[in-house]
Design a protein with these regions (language model features):
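Alpha-helical solenoid scaffolds in large eukaryotic transport, assembly, and signaling factors
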Residues: 2-122
Length: 122
């Protein structure tokens, strides 16, 4: 059975990601976060929300997790974006790599940019 596709605001996604990266989350809370993220990633708007977290969040762990989660789903959503949106995403990813001070976050964003057989991202 497929889960529902959910939409999250910046703040809602931030709270979920913070729970996941926190040092001692409760098992039930963590499982709930995983379930919400699983459904959220089905939404094409998740790409924009993950990019916002990577760009704007002050917590390195949240930015890194957002990049990892985006990397896992962008391939699915990429064909649904028009050329202008693809170009904007490419520019933003390059900007994020160029400006990121945290090595692990930068590496996670770089993995998004890796080319694959179908010509994803860059």
């Amino acid at each position: 059975m497929e889960g529902k596709v959910v939409n999250l605001s910046y703040e809602e996604l931030e709270a979920i990601l913070l729970t996941v990266v926190s040092s001692n989350p409760k098992k039930e809370e963590l499982q709930n976060c995983y379930n919400v993220l699983k459904d959220f990633k089905k939404n094409i708007n998740s790409v924009e929300q993950f990019l916002k977290q990577i760009k704007m969040n002050k917590n390195d762990k949240i930015r890194q997790l957002a990049a990892i989660l985006l990397n896992r789903k962008i391939e699915k959503h990429w064909p649904n974006f028009n050329d202008q949106i693809k170009l904007e995403i490419k520019k933003l990813l390059l900007e994020l790599i160029r400006n990121e001070k945290n090595y692990l976050v930068s590496k996670a964003v770089q993995f998004i940019c890796l080319d694959f057989e179908n010509g994803r991202v860059i």
